């Protein structure tokens, strides 16, 4: 879904032929994992605390990355990848070996020991040069929509204009395209409506997440995915609310933002246009949510990063806080060490200090994704040469 919530690339100087891109920053550094005892101890793969493990989901995510890595697109991407020592062949061999270890290991401890023995840990240098990475979450929302506009369903998602490649730059802003109220743009999108949603904030959030599963009023299910975006930068509406004193940065979560606009709907006209970027969609025929590598993303096993800096499709390890339902139904934060695959990107995911975790589809996934907002660490795992 090329992620747009929290996602595309820092500037690189690209030189073709035998030269690599020139990096203005160093995104990854080799480190020893020994300083953190719990690093690589992924308890979710096996049954834990009475819950079913997700080993098959992890294996499926690995297979999706392998599918990408064998494509011509991956060959091109890795020819230009700037970090010395990280090649497509090494990434493939690393995934093949890790998959074998996941199948042969019988416990988190056994897998952790094998990974520490056989793999090199490349830590993201983070937003401070010392490995501090900011984590957020994203999800595939589910909403009700209509194939035709009605009094109830008024807010459209739009197809990519057929002449989009010929639009003059910079592209029009969100305000120009859809108006302050989301319904009174300059007319250039007229006739490109794909579906209509009931609430304006829902249509906006589909643009933020980059895809959606829609329950149509005629009883059918439609899935939509990213088709393109304007060249305007992403600007966080939540940050705008913080800047204006509407909420505190410490309490900034997606549920809080939704709650604010539900109680003050007149503020939508003021704040949504402050994000000037605009996303277009296509119908995806019921396909699973798909990342920027054109392979499906897997709940809690796929991440989005800046693909100008990080190796696409590669095996990674995150050390971060993720919310889980407690026994009383509330969400509580837990520190986890989780093996993931780097399979997506997004308009606000820039630099070596940002990661977005895909949390799945639907309301619960959205609740959990919206509460991920903390610092952690990101590592890429490559077989020792």
Language-model regions: role of each:
Residues 8-11, 58, 335:
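Generic alpha-helix initiation/capping and coil-helix boundary signal
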Residues 1-9:
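Bacterial N-terminal signal peptides that target proteins for export
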Residues 285-385:
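C-terminal soluble interaction/assembly domains
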Residues 9-21:
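Bacterial N-terminal signal peptides
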Residues 27-285, 292-295:
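Secretory/export targeting leaders with adjacent low-complexity proregions
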